[in-house]
Structure formats: C-alpha cells, structure tokens
Amino acid sequence: MNLEGKIALVTGASRGIGRAIAELLVERGATVIGTATSEGGAAAISEYLGENGKGLALNVTDVESIEATLKTINDECGAIDILVNNAGITRDNLLMRMKDDEWNDIINTNLTPIYRMSKAVLRGMMKKRAGRIINVGSVVGTMGNAGQTNYAAAKAGVIGFTKSMAREVASRGVTVNTVAPGFIETDMTKALNDDQRAATLSNVPAGRLGDPREIASAVVFLASPEAAYITGETLHVNGGMYMV
C-alpha cells in the first residue's frame, strides 16, 4: 500500500487514533498534515511528523478556520488527496438529563464538520478524478449505547452521510468510507478502573481492547489504491463486539 506523493489531511491528530493514523500514513509514504485544536497541539504534531508533514491549528466547528487551514495546505502542499475526518468529542449523559448544549456540541463537532471538510476538499479531488475520504465513526453509531444518544446520533449520521456522498462522487474516482472503531486503548480507556475494564471486555469476544494502530491500518487500507473499488462502506474494527 504505497502512498508516495499523496497529500493527506488528518483532523484530531495530536494523540490516540488520530496520531496513529497520521504516523502510519507517513510510513506508507504520504505527506501528512495533522490538525489539533490548539497551537501547542499543532506544534506537537509537527514534532512527531518531522520532515514528513506538519501540524496546524484547526477549529473544525468554525467555517473561517476551515477555509484558512485548507488555503494554507493548498498553497504549501497542493490539493489534498486523502482526507481523514477523525476529530471528535464526547458529552455523555442520560437523555432525561441531557442539556441542549451537550447535544449541540456533539452534533456541531462530530457531524457537521464532516460535511464541511468533505465539501471543502471535494472540488480538488473531482478535478483530479481521484480522492479518498475516510470518516472515523464508532460502533456506537450502529448498536447504540445508553448515555450517548447525542454521540450515537452523530456517528449514525456519519454513516448515512458516507453512503450518500459515496453515491454522488463514485463516478469521479473519489471513494468515501467509514471506519467504525469499537473499544480502543486510548487515554480515556486507560482511566477505567478494573471493574469498568472487566465490564467493557465482557462484551468483546476478542477479549481485549483494540490498539489505535489497528484502526490506522483500516484507514490506510481504505486510502490506498488497493481499495479503489470500495466505497460507501463501513469497516467495523471492534474485536467482534458488534457483527453486522
């Protein structure tokens, strides 16, 4: 899976799954621009990417920030070949207790930017008649989870968006897919106590949490020439927790 000469943009690349994706794309030969919400986070991305890319500060909820970031990338690197929409947050609460801000924050961060970022890179991809858009979803978007109606709705929306956009752009050589992780070893899961961890693993036939690099491998495959005939799909990477 050689990605030499490709320009990749990965949102939310400062740590966890996003960082693993950015690092593996670099290993496969791509030049990677990773984004973070702060200048400090962007600097950290630049440090780990080295001469193979750079970090930029991006607020995915702000239209002007998106436009400015994409202009910088186009001016310095050229048109984007691979977009990985990874940035996201959680605001968990039971529906009866959920505040409007908790709902809106999730939709505005986890769903709306998928539309804005994808639309922003699409013209360049269609002009080249080639492109890859990979959206990072979640197992919660298909199976649901108590306390996450906002998050589940957003991630289910990502899947619907992916399928619809894929139908619109397939004839132009652009593929659009979703990778849906299950429970992955991240800073958030490392904070679980033993009982919480055991309860989580009881639902995973593989008997372990996933590694961020396993998600990255799925993303990089979908970004590769070998995946040119795959579009509109959701690739579940969850250790058997949810089987379609």
From Swiss-Prot:
UniProt EC number: 1.1.1.100
Taxonomically, which superkingdom?
A: Bacteria
The keyword Endoplasmic reticulum appears for this protein:
no
Q: Where does substrate bind?
A: 138
Task: Give an example GO biological process.
Answer: fatty acid elongation
Q: Indicate which residues the UniProt annotation says bind NADP(+).
A: 12-15, 37, 59-60, 86, 151-155, 184
Catalyzed chemical reaction(s):
a (3R)-hydroxyacyl-[ACP] + NADP(+) = a 3-oxoacyl-[ACP] + NADPH + H(+)
Annotated active site residues, numbered on this chain, are 151 (proton acceptor)
- Say if the entry is tagged with keyword Signal: no
Arranged from A to Z, the UniProt key words for this protein are:
Fatty acid biosynthesis, Fatty acid metabolism, Lipid biosynthesis, Lipid metabolism, NADP, Oxidoreductase
Record-linked InterPro entries: 3oxo_ACP_reduc, NAD(P)-bd_dom_sf, Sc_DH/Rdtase_CS, SDR, SDR_fam
Q: Which SMART domains match?
A: PKS_KR (SM00822)
Q: Where are the transmembrane segments?
A: none
GO molecular function ontology, one term from the record: NADP binding
Quaternary assembly = Homotetramer.
**Protein role:** Catalyzes the NADPH-dependent reduction of beta-ketoacyl-ACP substrates to beta-hydroxyacyl-ACP products, the first reductive step in the elongation cycle of fatty acid biosynthesis.
The name this protein carries in UniProt is 3-oxoacyl-[acyl-carrier-protein] reductase FabG
Please report the organism this UniProt entry assigns to the protein.
Vibrio harveyi (Beneckea harveyi)
